Amino acid sequence: MDRRAWLIGSGLCVLGRAAFGAPSAQSLAMMAREGGVLLIRHTSTEPGVGDPPGFTLGQCSSQRNLSEAGRAEAIGIGAWFSQHGLQPRAVLSSQWCRCQDTARLAFGRYEDWPALNSTFSTQDQQAPQLQMLRRRLRQLPSGALEVWVTHQVIMTGLTGAYPAMGEGFLVDAGGTLRARGLMRSGS
C-alpha cells in the first residue's frame, strides 16, 4: 500500500470507529484509488434548531452560529488533517455561516456551493440539490478527495444516516456511505 493509501486508511480507521466498524484493507485501498468525499456536518453550535425567523444568508448575526466548543472542534478537524498529511482537492461549504466557519477554521479555505445549503425550511429544494451533489460525486476524478461542509438534512438526504455535529461521512463516487466518525487531533 502506498503512502497516500496508508494516510487515507489511517483517517478511515478513525472515521470507522462509529457504527460501521473499521473498514477493511480492501475498502481503504479502493477509496485511495477511486477517491471520495468527506461530508462534514458543521461543528457544534449555540443552542437551538434551525435558524431564527428572518435569518439572512451572509448576515451571521441573524443565524445560529458555532459555539466556542464548535470553533475548537473545527480547528481540531484541521489539525487532524494536517497530522495525517491529508490535503483535500477542494473544500466546499454551504452558505450558512456555521458551515463557512467550520470550513475556514479547519482548512483555511473554502468555496461556497449552494447545493450544500440547508433545506430544513425549504424541503422542496432538497431533491434538486441532492441531484447536484450526486452529479459532482460521479464526476470526481479517480483518487481525488474533497471535503463538503454542510447540514444534517443534506447528509441524511444523501446517505440515509443521521450525523452528529462535527461528524464526517466518507462517501464514494456512487454516494455510498463507507465510513463515519469524528476527527480529532491526536487520534
Briefly describe each language-model feature range:
Residues 35-38, 142-150:
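Generic beta-sheet signal
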Residues 84-86, 140-143:
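Glycine-rich phosphate-binding loop signature in dinucleotide/nucleotide-binding domains
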Residues 130-140:
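A short, acidic, amphipathic alpha-helical segment used as a generic capping/interface helix at domain edges
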Residues 23-123, 131, 161-187:
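Active-site-proximal alpha-helix that buttresses catalytic centers in soluble enzyme cores
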Residues 5-21:
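N-terminal export signals
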